[in-house]
Amino acid sequence: MGRRSSKDRSITPDILLRAYSIGLFPMAESSDDPELFWVEPDLRGIIPLDSFHYSKSLAKIIRQKPFDIRFDTAFAAVLDKCAEPAPDRPSTWINQTIRDLYTALFQMGHAHSVEAFEGDELVGGLYGVSLGAAFFGESMFSRRSNASKICLVHLVERLRAQGFVLLDTQFTTEHLKTFGAIDVAKDEYSKMLEEAVTMANVPFLLPEEISP
């Protein structure tokens, strides 16, 4: 992991968007640490939108529609759930500074969530940042089997339909590789990023999903 600069508590939403546009993103040492540091990986994780794929078994589950999938209806709740400890993630980097910054980006129309509901219960979701024609995935959670996977599938379908050209996952994991995630070198990523963020901001929501 490549770090840039020292810890900082003076980051504003506008500075955060500028950082994304040049390949940086913030993290914290822990949820209890109010400070952030910038990260610029030497190898950047992306999911090429034209080669995203998933298993036949997951496709079968998706056809059964086990969850009600929504967009941008419970952003704060998704953020809270992503910040909660889980058996496979005893601690997280989502501190109060992160919460405040990404809530501000959501209010500006630059952060979004995909949510899986089981009845009235939020059981899975993910959130990320949109800028130009790029979407930067930040975190996801799952409280039911396959919930976050299904949210990812719906995210990619939405990004494709709306005209996004870059899905940045920051890092690759074995889990994300099953969906087609790859590592790209910093120089190659910079070219892809510049192309994506210099395009006009692509709307994430459909017209009927926008509150009057």
Swiss-Prot record:
Assigned GO CC terms: cytoplasm
InterPro entries: Acyl_CoA_acyltransferase, Leu/Phe-tRNA_Trfase, Leu/Phe-tRNA_Trfase_C
Top-level division of the source organism's lineage: Bacteria
Pfam families with a match to the protein in the record: Leu_Phe_trans (PF03588)
Subcellular location field: Cytoplasm
EC number: 2.3.2.6
Record keywords: Acyltransferase, Cytoplasm, Transferase
Catalytic EC class: transferase
Catalytic activity: N-terminal L-lysyl-[protein] + L-leucyl-tRNA(Leu) = N-terminal L-leucyl-L-lysyl-[protein] + tRNA(Leu) + H(+); N-terminal L-arginyl-[protein] + L-leucyl-tRNA(Leu) = N-terminal L-leucyl-L-arginyl-[protein] + tRNA(Leu) + H(+); L-phenylalanyl-tRNA(Phe) + an N-terminal L-alpha-aminoacyl-[protein] = an N-terminal L-phenylalanyl-L-alpha-aminoacyl-[protein] + tRNA(Phe)
Any one GO biological process: protein catabolic process
Molecular function in Gene Ontology: leucyl-tRNA--protein transferase activity
Primary subcellular site in the record, as a coarse category: cytoplasm
Function summary: Functions in the N-end rule pathway of protein degradation where it conjugates Leu, Phe and, less efficiently, Met from aminoacyl-tRNAs to the N-termini of proteins containing an N-terminal arginine or lysine.
Record-stated family: Belongs to the L/F-transferase family.
NCBIfam families in alphabetical order: aat (TIGR00667)
HAMAP family per the UniProt record, alphabetical: Leu_Phe_trans
Name of the protein: Leucyl/phenylalanyl-tRNA--protein transferase
Organism: Allorhizobium ampelinum (strain ATCC BAA-846 / DSM 112012 / S4) (Agrobacterium vitis (strain S4))
